[in-house]
Curated annotation (Swiss-Prot):
It comes from Thermoanaerobacter pseudethanolicus (strain ATCC 33223 / 39E) (Clostridium thermohydrosulfuricum). Keywords: ATP-binding, Cytoplasm, Disulfide bond, Nucleotide-binding, RNA-binding, Transferase, tRNA processing, tRNA-binding. Residues 154-156, 310-311 are annotated as: Interaction with tRNA. This is tRNA-specific 2-thiouridylase MnmA 1. The keyword Cytoplasm applies. Disulfide bonds join C106-C204.
Length: 364
C-alpha cells in the first residue's frame, strides 16, 4: 500500500482517543474517527458499562468530539470477530482454570489487526489509538521499537507486546510523549465534552464487574462445584466452580483452618482448586508460550531483562532463555507473588519492550 497521511483513529469516547484525534489533525493528517461496535448482549442492545468503550454513551461522546474537532466519524461493526477472539477466549480460559487478559487479546486481534484491515480498505495507511506508548524506528537495528511512554504511571506497553513489525509500521501513538494531566488540560482548553470523563476501570463487556455471572451466561458447559485440596492433596471442602478463583486469591474461599489460605493452583481437569499458605503463593520460575519479540527478531540465547507478570506489577530482574518449542523459560532473581497462568509476562531493557508471552505455568 502506498504511504499516505490518512489515519483511522480508534475512538472509544474517552479523553485519550479524543485528544489523539485532535493532535493528529493538527499535525496535518487526514483523520477519520472510528468507534468499534464490539459487543452486544442477548437483547441486541449495547452493553452499558459506565465509561466503557462498548456503551451507547461512548458512541455519542465520540461523535460529539468528532464534530467538535471537524473530522469524519463512523461506527463499524466488529461484533462477530470480537466474540470469537475476545469473548470466547475470555470464557474458555476461565473454564480451563486460567486467568485471561482480554485487553491484550483485543489489542492483538481487534484494534491492531481487524481495525487495521478496515483502515486499509478505506485507503488509510495508519491506525492510531490513545495508548500511552512510544513507537520509534531504530536505524541500527533496522526495526521498529516499542518504548515506554513519558508518563510512566500511565504506560500501556504491557498490553501492546504482541505488536508485529508490520503493525508498528502502520500504528501511531500520539500521546506517547504526553502526561495524562497534560492530555486532560488540553482537552479542557479545547472545550472537548469528554475532558473530565473518568478513565474506564472495568473490562468493557462485563457489567457490574461480575465475571462469574458473565461466564455462566456465555459458557457452553455447566459450571460445576468441585473440591478444595491442600498442596498435599488433602480434602479441605467444596468450591463453587473454578471460574470463581484465581492464583493468589484469599477472599471468598469460605475455608478456615486457623491460618490464611490462598489459591496456589487450579487443576481444571479434575475440577480441584489447590489452597496453600502465604509462602506457597510465591515462585521464581515460569514458562511462557505464544511469545512475540519486538526489539529482536527472536530469542536465540540467554538474556538479562526486567520482567513483569501483570499490568500493575513492578518490573523485576530476570533471565530469559529460549526453549526448543518456541517457549521461553523465565528465572526471576527474587520470588514473585502469584505467577498466574493465562496472564502475560513482558520483558524490558530499560524503556524498550523486548517482547513477551502468555504464562503457561509456574515451574517452582
Amino acid at each position: 500500500m502506498k504511504k499516505n497521511n490518512r489515519v483511522v483513529v480508534g475512538m472509544s469516547g474517552g479523553v485519550d482517543s479524543s485528544v489523539s484525534a485532535y493532535l493528529l489533525k493538527e499535525q496535518g493528517f487526514d483523520v477519520i474517527g472510528v468507534t468499534m461496535q464490539i459487543w452486544q448482549d442477548k437483547d441486541e442492545e449495547a452493553v452499558r458499562v459506565e465509561g466503557g468503550c462498548c456503551s451507547l454513551s461512548a458512541v455519542n461522546d465520540a461523535r460529539r468530539v468528532a464534530n467538535k474537532i471537524g473530522i469524519k466519524y463512523y461506527v463499524m461493526n466488529f461484533k462477530d470477530v470480537f466474540k470469537e477472539k475476545v469473548i470466547d477466549y475470555f470464557v474458555d480460559e476461565y473454564l480451563k482454570g486460567r486467568t485471561p487478559n482480554p485487553c491484550i487479546a483485543c489489542n492483538k486481534y481487534i484494534k491492531f489487526e481487524e481495525l487495521l484491515k478496515r483502515a486499509w480498505m478505506i485507503d488509510a495507511y495508519y491506525v492510531a489509538t490513545g495508548h500511552y506508548a512510544i513507537k520509534e524506528y531504530d536505524e541500527e537495528r533496522g526495526r521498529y521499537l516499542l518504548k515506554k511512554s513519558v508518563d510512566t504511571s500511565k504506560d500501556q506497553t504491557y498490553v501492546l507486546y504482541n505488536l508485529t513489525q508490520t503493525q508498528l509500521e502502520h500504528i501511531l501513538f500520539p500521546l506517547g510523549k504526553y502526561k495524562k494531566d497534560e492530555v486532560r488540560e488540553l482537552a479542557k482548553n479545547l472545550g472537548l465534552p469528554v475532558a473530565s470523563k473518568p478513565d474506564s476501570q472495568e473490562i468493557c463487556f462485563v457489567t457490574d464487574n461480575d465475571y462469574g455471572k458473565f461466564i455462566r451466561e456465555n459458557a457452553k458447559e455447566e459450571i460445576k462445584p468441585g473440591e478444595f485440596r491442600d498442596t498435599r492433596g488433602r480434602f479441605l471442602g467444596y468450591h463453587k466452580g473454578i471460574i470463581h478463583y484465581t492464583i493468589g486469591q484469599r477472599k471468598g474461599l469460605g475455608i478456615s483452618v486457623g491460618k490464611p489460605l490462598y489459591v496456589v493452583d487450579i487443576d481444571a481437569e479434575n475440577n480441584v482448586v489447590v489452597l496453600g499458605y502465604g509462602d506457597e503463593v510465591f515462585g521464581d520460575e515460569l514458562i511462557s508460550y505464544n511469545n512475540n519479540f519486538i526489539s529482536i527478531d527472536k530469542l536465540e540465547r540467554e538474556m538479562r531483562v526486567k520482567a513483569k507478570i501483570r499490568y500493575n506489577a513492578k518490573e523485576q530482574d530476570a533471565v530469559i532463555r529460549p526453549l526448543e518449542d518456541g517457549k521461553v523459560f523465565v528465572k526471576f532473581d527474587n520470588p514473585q507473588r502469584a505467577i498466574t497462568p493465562g496472564q502475560s509476562v513482558v520483558f524490558y531493557e530499560g524503556d524498550i519492550v523486548v517482547g513477551g508471552g502468555t504464562i503457561e505455568r509456574k515451574v517452582r
